[in-house]
Swiss-Prot record:
Keyword vocabulary terms for this entry: Mitochondrion
Keyword Mitochondrion tagged: yes
Primary subcellular site in the record, as a coarse category: mitochondrion
A single BP term in Gene Ontology: mitochondrial genome maintenance
Family: Belongs to the GEP5 family.
Gene Ontology cellular component terms for the protein in this record: mitochondrion
Reported function: Essential for respiratory growth and required for maintenance of mtDNA. Required for cell survival in the absence of prohibitins.
Protein location: Mitochondrion
Organism: Saccharomyces cerevisiae (strain YJM789) (Baker's yeast)
Protein name according to UniProt: Genetic interactor of prohibitin 5, mitochondrial
Keyword Aminoacyl-tRNA synthetase: no
Amino acid sequence: MASQVNALLLPVIESTPLHQITKVALTTTLTSKQSDYKFKEIAVPLTKSLQLYEKAQRRQDLRASLKALESIIYQTHFQWNNPLPRHAHLFQKHYHFLLTHWPFENHRDLVDSIAVNNGKLNSTSSRSVWLKADWITLFNVKNPWVQTPPSLVRLSGTDLDTFTPERIFLINSLGNHYKFLIANSHLSYNHKKYPSPGVQIPIRNALGEVSPAKQIAQLFARQLSHIYKSLFIENPPLSPENELALTAVFYDETVERRLRRLYMRACARAYTTTNADSTTEPLMFHCTRWEVD
């Protein structure tokens, strides 16, 4: 199937006015050995964007044509051909640890604490708490709702609750990543505002009861899915290799100004890691500044 689809897509890609660096990245990604699922993840949205581009060209709709090309540029260099940063891989590796230690706020306990705090609501759900706090301290409490499967206990070579150096690196890198995106809201996908990342456990009824444990456990799973999607799919950091590749596009003297500006718009949300090779110090992030005439 992949070879048949590529036979249709590759000539269309070559006919677009995109820079050769983007065309090579696209071609390499499509023709590399991968599962049908991974191939479809790229081929389906790419086909849609190319169809939009061709229709816009036939209608001589310049705006729609440029929008389709912008989408292809962004998806190629930021998503399809962009290696995940180290803390994304560690997120997957230590998923169960994050699931059982992800910070939460139990509304039942919050209501009960009002009397103790002289009628004041002592909430930890505000973004300011997450921006100022040491994230390791926020992860110190293990939640009682997520159960560890026996199979995971048998397979694990380390204590599932131990704050290993790798897990500390992961948590602090996630904290830096979240704080960076909050501080640079112009980078967010669809101008999305990031709420507090803690799990909120609501009161179920007027009696103050909360949901069953299984439903609460699902809240943690959904929140981690949301966090992963926000940091690594919708707003992924640009890899150092891709940053260099795009810099080469911007500094290519043969590129027309209109095409350079197209790339500028497509890459306006670019940011990358300052210390991508670090394995001890948590990752830091900075906005990418493209110098374009």
